[in-house]
């Protein structure tokens, strides 16, 4: 296994792991002991889906959300700098795409650390695939706000 920050896609919903993630992903995941995650509980659940025998208590989790400072993120990467592979796990789908994982990737790249995205489901790409629209001119403007007034404003600006 190469030394890198691995971007680990997560299944969407209750989809069985083996129907959407290649065996290579499982191999990589089982070689990682340090994970930067959006939510520790859901990350632990995902890892147990990957391998029921995984020793969750032997793993280290670093929480990443909109409140995590760049300084904290930089510190999270210490195991990688010291020679241990790390993984980034989002709530669902691909980390770093319309996701706080993008901040981790940017900081890792500034530190000249290797970043390896793994194959997996992306709600954004799946929606384009199923839409019938031409993917050549696709543009993603981000997820719309939940608050109705903010959402209306966002739609006007688009």
Q: Where would I find each of the regions flagged by the language model?
A:
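Conserved helicase motor
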Residues: 63-68, 144
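Conserved small/polar residues in nucleotide/adenosyl-binding loops
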Residues: 156-158
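Alpha-helical segments flanking ligand/cofactor-binding loops in enzyme cores
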Residues: 26-27, 77-78, 102-106
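Structural signal for short hydrophobic segments within the conserved structured cores
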Residues: 6, 62, 116, 139-142
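Glycine-rich, highly charged phosphate/nucleotide-binding loops
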Residues: 67-76
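Short glycine-cluster motifs
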Residues: 82-139
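Active-site glycine-rich loop that binds ribose-phosphate moieties when present
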Residues: 147-154
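Glycine-rich, flexible N-terminal cofactor/catalytic loop recognition
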Residues: 1-64
